[in-house]
């Protein structure tokens, strides 16, 4: 018997059953418990959502910016009021520790919504004189109905990252959460409605890619797609979106990000950063710094610091507030991570810690993989080249800065990068040479609302967050005004 009742689709400000009658199970990855049967949307449901979104968007766009912002700020207040309940639901669905979901997931999502409610007035055009008696001006108009596809690792945060700029700019959104973790997106839809968002402006269609995701990307009445997920899937989404109606796309994709520890770095600080860059959220973070470059002479000392820290990780029930490391999000993902670990062993990486599924006591019921550290890694190893999206740190040594930069950039990815050094001149010099969209100096992982987030190369197209993202959910109209009598050449 599932813990929760059947979860329906959210269309037009209310819950409705899927027209096809199909459902799928959502499972707690820490225990194997079935949490709910979720209705699986299809193309017919999408058509209904688009019709609802078009009607709602006309009303939403007709409101003043201030009126829209007031509604969004009411949603912010509701999110913060229900932080603990939403965090517990997120923990049940994702397996992330409650200590994490309470302090990060809903909090940072609400921060982004608050940010866009505040900066929506910044959507201002320009007025440019052309000559005496003639000028032009520009205005930013909403795109209309936009689609978004979320990832399973930060379900409600990603939903808010995508919805906030879209709604602030006057659009309606159809959001497809990951079929692995769809529960909190539905709660977000309830909150938007309670806050006063017009019916149809935020719809949630749970389901898999084949049933509804592909239909969403190619629907001719959807003007933009924002996608977060793997690079391979991102290519398919982009191809489908462009072939159907030349949709604009934003893609936040995979990464294999480098963290460079400089020769003058405080090794304790560097080890703390490397731990957070690899084992936070059990390693299931797209920006993780999984390729850790350390000077050859410092390898042994750095290994010792990592080993001391990794043994302090508290692995256990995600609902226990002492837990700092939970399971993989699903059995299928756990198996993929374990296969990469075995490949690392087979290709000659030296296993320092972990490298196995955890089966002690209650952990055996869940999808737990030990935090894993490999040393003596080389650039050609699969664990160094491919995104694992799990708790696997690859330690590499280098001899000089030029070598470190060259090797750090020798990847098809370019999502994030970091440098640890007390020498800020060196830090900026290295960061400016690294081919990555998000960079950190002496820290890792924070993505505040005003800071654009996105990748270079195969790690993405466009940006999330920041002022430019608000503009990306609009189209620019140019209007020339002639004050004098128009002179025809005919």
Swiss-Prot record:
The keyword Cytoplasm does not apply. Its EC number is 1.2.1.8. Keywords: Metal-binding, NAD, NADP, Oxidation, Oxidoreductase, Potassium. K(+) 2 binds at residues 246, 457, 460. GO terms for biological process: glycine betaine biosynthetic process from choline. K(+) 1 binds at residues 93, 180. Pathway: Amine and polyamine biosynthesis; betaine biosynthesis via choline pathway; betaine from betaine aldehyde: step 1/1. Gene3D superfamilies: Aldehyde Dehydrogenase, Chain A, domain 1 (3.40.605.10), Aldehyde Dehydrogenase, Chain A, domain 2 (3.40.309.10). Pfam families: Aldedh. Belongs to the aldehyde dehydrogenase family. This is Betaine aldehyde dehydrogenase.
């Amino acid at each position: 018997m599932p813990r929760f009742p059947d979860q329906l689709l959210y269309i037009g400000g209310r819950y409705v059953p899927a027209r096809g009658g199909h459902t799928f199970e959502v499972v707690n990855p820490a225990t194997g418990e079935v949490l709910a049967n979720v209705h699986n949307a299809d193309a017919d449901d999408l058509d209904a959502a688009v019709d609802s979104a078009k009607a709602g968007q006309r009303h939403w766009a007709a409101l003043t910016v201030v009126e829209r912002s007031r509604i969004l700020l009411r949603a912010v207040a509701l999110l913060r009021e229900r932080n603990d309940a939403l965090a517990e639901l997120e923990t049940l669905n994702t397996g992330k520790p409650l200590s994490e979901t309470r302090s990060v997931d809903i909090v940072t999502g609400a921060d982004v919504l608050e940010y866009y409610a505040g900066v929506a007035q910044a959507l201002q055009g320009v007025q440019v004189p052309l000559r005496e008696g003639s000028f032009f001006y520009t205005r930013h108009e909403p795109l209309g109905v936009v689609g978004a596809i979320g990832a399973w690792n930060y379900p409600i945060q990603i939903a808010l990252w995508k919805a906030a700029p879209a709604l602030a700019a006057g659009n309606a959104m159809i959001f497809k959460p990951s079929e692995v973790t769809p529960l909190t997106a539905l709660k977000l839809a309830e909150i938007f409605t309670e806050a006063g968002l017009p019916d149809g402006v935020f719809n949630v269609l749970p389901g898999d890619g084949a049933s509804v995701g592909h239909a969403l990307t190619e629907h001719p009445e959807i003007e933009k797609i924002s996608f977060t997920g793997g690079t391979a899937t991102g290519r398919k989404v982009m191809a489908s979106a462009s072939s159907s109606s030349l949709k604009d796309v934003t893609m936040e994709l995979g990464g294999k990000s480098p963290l460079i520890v400089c020769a003058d770095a405080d090794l304790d600080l560097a080890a703390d950063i490397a731990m957070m860059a690899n084992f936070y959220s059990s390693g299931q973070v797209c920006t993780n710094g999984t390729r850790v470059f350390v000077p050859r002479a410092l390898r042994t000392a750095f290994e010792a610091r990592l080993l001391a820290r990794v043994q302090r990780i508290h692995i256990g029930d995600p609902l226990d507030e002492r837990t700092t490391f939970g399971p993989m999000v699903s059995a299928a993902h756990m198996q993929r991570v374990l296969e990469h670990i075995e490949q690392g062993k087979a290709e000659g990486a030296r296993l320092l810690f972990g490298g196995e599924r955890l089966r002690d006591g209650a952990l055996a019921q869940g999808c737990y993989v030990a935090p894993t550290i490999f040393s003596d890694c080389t650039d050609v190893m699969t664990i160094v080249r491919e995104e694992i999206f799990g708790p696997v740190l690859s330690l590499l040594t280098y001899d000089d800065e030029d070598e470190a930069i060259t090797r750090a950039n020798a990847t098809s990815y370019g999502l994030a990068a970091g440098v640890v050094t007390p020498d800020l001149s060196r830090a900026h010099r290295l960061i400016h040479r690294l081919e990555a969209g998000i960079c950190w100096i002496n820290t890792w992982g924070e993505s505040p609302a005003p800071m654009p987030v996105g990748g270079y190369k195969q790690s993405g197209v466009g940006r999330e967050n920041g002022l430019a993202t608000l503009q990306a959910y609009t189209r620019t109209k140019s209007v020339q005004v002639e004050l004098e009598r128009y002179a025809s050449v005919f």
